[in-house]
Amino acid sequence: MVTVEEVRKAQRAQGPATIMAIGTSTPQNCVDQSTYPDYYFRITNSEHLVELKEKFKRMCEKSMIKKRYMYLTEEILTENPNICAYMAPSLDARQDIVVVEVPKLGKEAAQKAIKEWGQPKSKITHLVFCTTSGVDMPGADYQLTKLLGLQPSVKRFMMYQQGCFAGGTVIRLAKDLAENNKGARVLVVCSEITAVTFRGPSDAHLDSLVGQALFGDGAAALIIGSDPDPDLERPLFQLVSAAQTILPDSGGAIDGHLREVGLTFHLLKDVPGLISKHIEKSLNEAFQPLGIRDWNSLFWIAHPGGPAILDQVEEKLELKPEKLRATRHVLSEYGNMSSACVLFILDEMRKASSKEGLNTTGEGLEWGVLFGFGPGLTVETVVLHSVSA
């Protein structure tokens, strides 16, 4: 007769969780940031707000974003004037869009990840789906299971309304699932569509306007598992540790509220200051066991909440400009895609490392850090170990 301890030992994987494939996807509609203020004020019938438009132009110029992708086209917005108005009842119209489109965009990213992984999708044992775009029952996890034709026995986790830190959260959860379930292969999907937050401008709500200048649509997917089969699977990054914390004195710094008018967004000006003030504590706690104190010796994947956050973190930690190159590249090419951003940056980093002939997936370096920042203020910290190219 076996003991509980023996059963538990047999259930656990041997090695650390590993990212084995990455896929990304965006809507087809691409928006140029330089012409966006004119388009945005025209489509929302707000061209009479001349001073506010100038303010928005400056926001877009300072955003360090070149382009974004958005499901909401001019045609869709023309058909849904309440989505364009400032604070008009519009939740039903928004929900009708995202409940269908969020799983569909997630499917595109997931298919790319599964193709790279190279294994039959029947081997996927767990699904973690994350979105801040709408809420439904059964959830986007169920819809994606049906769209992909996954096994009905796949073990699903649905994470709604987490916000911008959640790219770290899904990795932390997938790590625990992979390491505690021998043979588990976890499909992780983050899919975000700004149809829940888009609305016209108001000079009484400038933080909403900041969101209109920053947010973009995108989905990203990972395959995560422990003990990769060397003949069939190719590891990209190992997940060494993962932590979450709420920053002190940060209540109300970033809030989102789902209302009749859609998802409203509030942020305090001091968000970059709060993050940069406390980030070294998270780094010390994560890397002390490894004896690492030189933050420039790491490869960096940081959620690009906005250029000010990146600038202040860079300054506070005395990071060399190239440390946040991959992060700034994704911000420039896609905008802030909430939970999906850090997964896009992982993809950008491994591709650039390969293209440049570097000897690891992490810009030629061995150890790296992934940060998620979002409502709370909540910070996710993941320690990564790169894989030899």
From Swiss-Prot:
Keyword list, A-Z: Acyltransferase, Flavonoid biosynthesis, Transferase
PROSITE patterns: CHALCONE_SYNTH (PS00441)
Molecular function GO terms recorded: naringenin-chalcone synthase activity
Listed CDD domains: CHS_like (cd00831)
Keyword Thylakoid: no
Pathway note: Secondary metabolite biosynthesis; flavonoid biosynthesis
Stored InterPro entries: Chalcone/stilbene_synt_C, Chalcone/stilbene_synt_N, Chalcone/stilbene_synthase_AS, Polyketide_synthase_type-III, Thiolase-like
Catalytic activity of the protein: (E)-4-coumaroyl-CoA + 3 malonyl-CoA + 3 H(+) = 2',4,4',6'-tetrahydroxychalcone + 3 CO2 + 4 CoA
Any one biological process term the GO annotation gives: polyketide biosynthetic process
Protein family: Belongs to the thiolase-like superfamily. Chalcone/stilbene synthases family.
Protein purpose: The primary product of this enzyme is 4,2',4',6'-tetrahydroxychalcone (also termed naringenin-chalcone or chalcone) which can under specific conditions spontaneously isomerize into naringenin.
Name the record gives this protein: Chalcone synthase E
Lineage: Eukaryota, Viridiplantae, Streptophyta, Embryophyta, Tracheophyta
Protein's gene: CHSE
